[in-house]
Amino acid sequence: MSGSFELSVQDLNDLLSDGSGCYSLPSQPCNEVTPRIYVGNASVAQDIPKLQKLGITHVLNAAEGRSFMHVNTNANFYKDSGITYLGIKANDTQEFNLSAYFERAADFIDQALAQKNGRVLVHCREGYSRSPTLVIAYLMMRQKMDVKSALSIVRQNREIGPNDGFLAQLCQLNDRLAKEGKLKP
């Protein structure tokens, strides 16, 4: 591929780390990374009173499953709370194709934000790799941000570290959206 839009995983890693190449782990269980969109971990996702206090109307679990790498919630878990749920059975591995879920996740986030007081929590086990990747893809696809801008906005509001496979998928999305003229100039 050629073109000025092409970015590397290293370019994105440089935005995520400090000058010495160190990464920070999340200091809070949950952060509002852009208006009405929160990224968080399993503990906040499983704390329905806390979600209600935050005004969360929708929960997107980017790590649905029963293993130690996943968060074992489902629509039934939230049914009496009035919270709308979507689960994605994603693994936090470089080989996992999270981009296959970008559109579905973006539709769900849009559904939440279309409600007058809608707020969405996008979470995974730690709120560090899978869930921020989905929010970054959303900002690119629906708010026409390039990958560096979207990643920077999320990183300014939460310590994140998507794995290199997810960063590569975001670079591919950036190249595709740029070629289609779907990013802000």
Swiss-Prot record:
The GO cellular component terms are:
cytoplasm; cytoskeleton; cytosol; immunological synapse; motile cilium; nucleoplasm; nucleus
GO process terms (BP): cellular response to epidermal growth factor stimulus; dephosphorylation; negative regulation of cell migration; negative regulation of chemotaxis; negative regulation of epidermal growth factor receptor signaling pathway; negative regulation of ERK1 and ERK2 cascade; negative regulation of JNK cascade; negative regulation of MAPK cascade
Return the SUPFAM superfamilies for the record: (Phosphotyrosine protein) phosphatases II
Q: What Gene3D superfamilies does the record point to? A: Protein tyrosine phosphatase superfamily
Keywords, comma-separated and alphabetical: Cell projection, Cilium, Cytoplasm, Cytoskeleton, Flagellum, Hydrolase, Nucleus, Protein phosphatase
Q: What is this protein called?
A: Dual specificity protein phosphatase 3
Where it sits in the cell: the answer is:
Nucleus; Cytoplasm, Cytoskeleton, Flagellum axoneme
Give the organism the record lists: Homo sapiens (Human)
Q: What is its EC number?
A: 3.1.3.16, 3.1.3.48
The entry's function note states: Shows activity both for tyrosine-protein phosphate and serine-protein phosphate, but displays a strong preference toward phosphotyrosines. Specifically dephosphorylates and inactivates ERK1 and ERK2.
* Catalytic residues identified in the record: 124 (phosphocysteine intermediate)
- Report which reactions are catalysed by this protein: O-phospho-L-tyrosyl-[protein] + H2O = L-tyrosyl-[protein] + phosphate; O-phospho-L-seryl-[protein] + H2O = L-seryl-[protein] + phosphate; O-phospho-L-threonyl-[protein] + H2O = L-threonyl-[protein] + phosphate
**Gene Ontology molecular function:** cytoskeletal protein binding; MAP kinase phosphatase activity; phosphatase activity; protein kinase binding; protein serine/threonine phosphatase activity; protein tyrosine kinase binding; protein tyrosine phosphatase activity; protein tyrosine/serine/threonine phosphatase activity
**KW Hydrolase (keyword) present:** yes
Tyrosine-protein phosphatase domain mapped to chain residues? 28-179
What quaternary structure, including any partners, is listed in this protein's UniProt entry? Microtubule inner protein component of sperm flagellar doublet microtubules. Interacts with VRK3; this interaction activates DUSP3 phosphatase activity.
Family stated for the protein in its record: Belongs to the protein-tyrosine phosphatase family. Non-receptor class dual specificity subfamily.
